[in-house]
From Swiss-Prot:
The keyword RNA-binding applies. HAMAP family: Ribosomal_uS8_B (MF_01302_B). This is Small ribosomal subunit protein uS8. It comes from the Bacteria. Part of the 30S ribosomal subunit. Contacts proteins S5 and S12. InterPro entries: Ribosomal_uS8, Ribosomal_uS8_CS, Ribosomal_uS8_sf. PROSITE patterns: RIBOSOMAL_S8 (PS00053). One of the primary rRNA binding proteins, it binds directly to 16S rRNA central domain where it helps coordinate assembly of the platform of the 30S subunit. The lineage of its organism: Bacteria, Pseudomonadati, Pseudomonadota, Gammaproteobacteria, Pseudomonadales. GO terms for biological process: translation. Signal peptide: none annotated.
Length: 130
């Protein structure tokens, strides 16, 4: 059976690995998943990521913990295949009063809501992280 929403699968794998206190989680790689992993690393939510393999690339994400607790408290999919959420730059959501981030897919690439506001572009709100 084919995977309907690969990004939701990625977020679920990260959540499950953190609940099981794993240090690394692996999944099939895609351009979008690598872009989201890059944003998570830049924002300090994960320790690192690596793409391995040529024929079937695999994405390995190194999870981050602080004092035994996962750094990511909440990881939710916003836009989904059945109901896409596109927001203008003025309507981009703030997560928990600006403490968290929304990851947005824009015509200038995948970035945080803060970077999208600074660039003056809106786009599809992929997920929220806190």
């Amino acid at each position: 059976m084919s995977m309907q929403d690969p990004l939701a699968d990625m977020l679920t794998r990260i959540r499950n690995a953190q609940m099981a206190e794993k240090s690394v989680v692996s999944m099939p790689s895609s351009t979008l998943k690598v872009a989201v992993a890059k944003v998570l690393k830049d924002e300090g939510y994960i320790a690192g990521y690596q793409v391995t393999g040529e024929a079937k690339p695999s994405l390995s994400i190194e999870l981050k913990y602080f004092e035994g607790r996962p750094v990511i408290e909440e990881l939710k999919r916003s836009s989904r295949p059945g109901l896409r959420q596109y927001k203008a730059v003025t309507d981009l959501p703030k997560v928990r009063g600006g403490l968290g981030v929304s990851i947005v897919s824009t015509n200038k690439g995948v970035m945080t809501d803060r970077a999208a506001r600074a660039a003056g572009v809106g786009g599809e709100v992929l997920c929220t992280v806190f």
